[in-house]
Regions:
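A contiguous strand-loop segment
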Residues: 11, 62, 66-88, 172-174
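Hydrophobic alpha-helical segments
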Residues: 41, 52, 116-117
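Short glycine/serine/threonine-biased micro-segments
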Residues: 40, 44, 91-94
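Sec-exported extracytoplasmic/periplasmic mature domains
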Residues: 22-26, 36-43, 55-59, 75-82, ...
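Short, solvent-exposed loop/turn and secondary-structure capping segments
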Residues: 44-48, 87-88
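Export/targeting segments at the very N-terminus of extracytoplasmic proteins
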Residues: 2-36, 46-72
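Flexible, glycine-rich surface segments
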Residues: 80, 84-175
Length: 175
């Protein structure tokens, strides 16, 4: 199961996760959870060719976002000696253990193993640290919760308890 795979991932990578947690201030369990959601703890890095995937999107009309990502893919390919025709990605061109789009790979990637290359495919240290760095650089606050309270919209505010129970939600909207 996913939970067992997560426990195994944390156990096998405990020292790395502990070190990254100290260095970046991001909980090892959140890091592991993201990697679990993105790649099933590294067991599935994708089956697509990122060059084909991003190239196709880059030349759709008025799609400057993917044109920039194509350039970023070429930059990371050259910098880290990755062949964009043979590495694997998700259907959306996301790369490596944390499934980063090329610009995020270039911007948030961390060479945590110190070999001079950010390698989110073959280095667990780099992949784990890059996920933590992404969270830290995007406002992660050490010791904070990853969720926040929200106000329920009018659509849900008028529902009776019986109506809410019929929705089969795993949380209570009326708290």
């Amino acid at each position: 199961s996913r939970i067992n795979n997560g426990a195994k991932f944390v156990k096998e990578n405990f020292e790395i996760l502990e070190s990254v947690e100290r260095d970046f201030g991001v909980s090892k369990f959140y890091i592991a959870s993201i990697i679990g959601c993105e790649t099933n703890y590294g067991s599935f890095l994708g089956t697509y060719n990122p060059l084909d995937t991003i190239f196709t999107r880059a030349f759709e009309p008025e799609n400057s976002f993917w044109q920039k990502e194509l350039i970023q893919l070429f930059i990371l390919s050259k910098e880290y000696n990755l062949d964009p025709k043979t590495i694997k990605s998700s259907w959306s061109g996301a790369l490596g253990l944390g499934q980063f789009i090329p610009s995020s790979y270039n911007f948030y990637g961390v060479d945590y193993d110190g070999d001079g290359v950010v390698d989110m495919y073959n280095s667990r240290k780099d992949g784990i640290a890059s996920v933590a760095n992404y969270l830290k650089e995007n406002g992660w606050k050490t010791g904070s919760f990853a969720v926040s309270e929200v106000t329920v919209g009018k659509k849900f505010a008028s529902l009776e308890d019986d109506d809410i129970a019929k929705l089969q939600l795993s949380f209570n909207l009326n708290k």
